Amino acid sequence: MILGIIGAMSEELEILLKDMKLETVEEKAKMKFHKGKLWGHDVVAVVCGIGKVNAAVCTQILASEYNVSSVINVGVAGGIGKDIYPGDVVIAENLVQYDMDTTAFGDPMGQIPRMDTFDFKCDKKLVETAKAACAEASDFKTFSGRIVSGDMFVASLDKIQWLEKIGRASCRERV
């Protein structure tokens, strides 16, 4: 089993890359794929760049060329809700694209046209594994729930409240 780990920025993977026992580094699509061992697991870690398209390209390369069984996206995000603070961890149970807008066709905001689902569910086993790992740490709080993702940096309170309303979200990705 090979695990793919992606982050948008180098700072998000810096600590993991330092702990990795590197075997190879390959460049594909202007991204560096670091293959090796991390805490006894076979891993390919990649800084994919900012944006959902970069993340999608990276994920496809991980699946097609490295045969990863799962992909974990790590990185910074903005908390939604009064109890989430910098340094806390949010584990996604499902994800919604907040910038997908086909409301003109009668779809709810975030709905991908012609799909029977509003959100993308995360692998339950990976979610439980992440929760168990975080439960062992005491220097941060852990939350789980919906993460909303979009290709914009959100800083206004109005937009944050809107994201909380449409997505019933715990966290917003900063892509």
Language-model region placement:
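Short, conserved "active-site rim" segments that organize catalytic pockets and cofactor/ligand binding
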Residues: 1-20
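Glycine-rich phosphate- or other oxyanion-binding loops that anchor nucleotides, phosphorylated ligands
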Residues: 2, 26-174
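Active-site regions of enzymes building and remodeling cell-envelope glycoconjugates
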Residues: 23
